[in-house]
């Protein structure tokens, strides 16, 4: 991703390197294979008779896609959680394409690395606790949604 966004790279004319947009692009590239693989597995695990049943009931293509996604919602939430986990803990790509520029492209993970390198372990630990808290709350909310959906 970094080589594509560098000034001499194929997307260099867009001047995206060291911007928040570059960080977003890098995070999408990192999480895409995880989310795509788990989503494909979730959809393939559906009972093949469900598609035939929906056809038999006269469902349109859009209605069928909606029902299949709805039926696979719990594994899809697991895919979302896995993608979030890979993105929230990532440091390298954010540092390379974002540059860790104060007030512009510094994110929690790169700030933790910076503060640890400067010897400010108290700040690094506080940022780490904040990152863990955010991660815990997001995963708790998604797990709650999954469990609520499983009861239906």
Regions inferred by a protein language model and the residue ranges of each:
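Residues that define the loop-to-transmembrane-helix transition and helix capping
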Residues: 17-21, 51, 62, 73, ...
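Helix-boundary and loop/linker segments of multi-pass membrane transporters
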Residues: 9-16, 68-71, 117
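Membrane-interfacial helix termini and adjacent extracytoplasmic/periplasmic loops
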Residues: 1-28, 98-101
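Membrane-interfacial segments
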Residues: 5-13, 46-47, 89, 101, ...
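Interhelical loop and adjacent transmembrane-helix boundary motif
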Residues: 11, 96-145
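Faces of alpha-helical transmembrane segments in polytopic inner-membrane proteins
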Residues: 16-40, 70-75, 82-89, 135
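C-terminal transmembrane helix and the adjacent membrane-cytosol boundary/short C-terminal tail
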Residues: 33, 37-51, 55-58, 62, ...
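Non-cytoplasmic
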Residues: 3, 76-114
């Amino acid at each position: 991703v970094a080589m594509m966004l560098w000034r001499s790279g194929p997307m260099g004319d867009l001047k995206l390197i060291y911007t928040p947009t570059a960080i977003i692009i890098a995070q999408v590239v990192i999480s895409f294979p995880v989310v795509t693989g788990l989503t494909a597995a979730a959809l393939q695990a559906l009972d093949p008779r469900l598609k035939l049943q929906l056809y038999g009931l006269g469902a349109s293509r859009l209605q069928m896609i909606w029902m299949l996604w709805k039926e696979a919602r719990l594994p899809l939430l697991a895919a979302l959680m896995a993608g979030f986990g890979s993105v929230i803990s990532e440091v390298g790509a954010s540092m390379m394409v974002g540059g860790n520029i104060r007030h512009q492209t510094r994110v929690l993970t790169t700030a933790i690395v910076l503060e640890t390198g400067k010897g400010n372990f108290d700040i690094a630990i506080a940022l780490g606790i904040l990152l863990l808290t955010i991660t815990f709350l997001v995963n708790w909310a998604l797990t709650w949604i999954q469990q609520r959906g499983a009861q239906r």
